[in-house]
């Protein structure tokens, strides 16, 4: 039996070009997909200022505000609070190689609780740009500063006669501490 038509011999290069053009034609038929929309940045809800008196400090609401790093030479600091009002300050005096931990309000003692250790310090009166604060001065290589810098989640500041405050453990305090160690 013979076939009614003869097969035509086509060179291999022409077959490859035909296959490529076929794929190109199919690709042109595919719909274009729009790029996904960029995620919209949503600000976290403001923290509610609630005086705390008991319970586990890890469950306390965070104090309202956020950390701000203020570079300077020889003084740099990390300030926590709303606007220009600071509730807690970590100040580095690089010339003296000292770190001052300050809390708004006047009290005789500061207890700072990190995720794995707490420390109690006698506090003195410190002036922060005209605002009365209680503070403690530590050597820049004091080990408790590392405990604060590497605390997981939050830090609590307790003082007799003042409500306790819970602060998020962000990078800004560690930056101020490291400025004193350079």
Task: List each model region and its residues.
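Internal interaction segment
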Residues: 2-7, 31-35, 120-182
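Glycine-centered tight beta-turn/hairpin loop motif at sheet-sheet or coil-to-beta transitions
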Residues: 83-85, 116-118, 160-162
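An ectodomain-focused feature that recognizes extracytoplasmic/extracellular
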Residues: 41-107
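C-terminal motif of bacterial Sec signal peptides marking the signal peptidase cleavage site
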Residues: 25-28
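Short, low-complexity, disordered segments immediately C-terminal to signal peptides
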Residues: 30-46
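Bacterial N-terminal signal peptides that target proteins for export
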Residues: 4-19
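Extended low-complexity, serine/threonine- and proline-enriched intrinsically disordered segments
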Residues: 108-119
């Amino acid at each position: 039996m013979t076939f009614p038509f003869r097969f035509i011999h086509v060179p291999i290069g022409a077959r490859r070009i035909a296959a490529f053009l076929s794929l190109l034609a199919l690709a042109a038929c595919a719909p274009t997909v729009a790029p996904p929309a960029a995620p919209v940045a949503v600000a976290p809800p403001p923290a509610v200022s609630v005086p705390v008196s008991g319970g586990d400090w890890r469950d306390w609401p965070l104090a309202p505000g956020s950390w701000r790093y203020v570079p300077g030479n020889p003084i740099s600091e990390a300030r926590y609070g709303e606007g220009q009002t600071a509730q807690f300050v970590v100040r580095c005096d690089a010339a003296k190689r000292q770190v001052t931990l300050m809390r708004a309000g006047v009290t005789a003692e500061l207890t700072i609780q990190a995720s794995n250790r707490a420390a109690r310090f006698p506090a003195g009166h410190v002036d922060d740009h005209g605002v009365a604060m209680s503070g403690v001065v530590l050597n820049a290589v004091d080990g408790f500063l590392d405990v604060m810098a590497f605390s997981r989640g939050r830090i609590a500041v307790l003082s007799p006669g003042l409500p306790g405050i819970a602060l998020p453990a962000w990078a800004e305090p560690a930056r101020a501490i490291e400025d004193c160690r350079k």
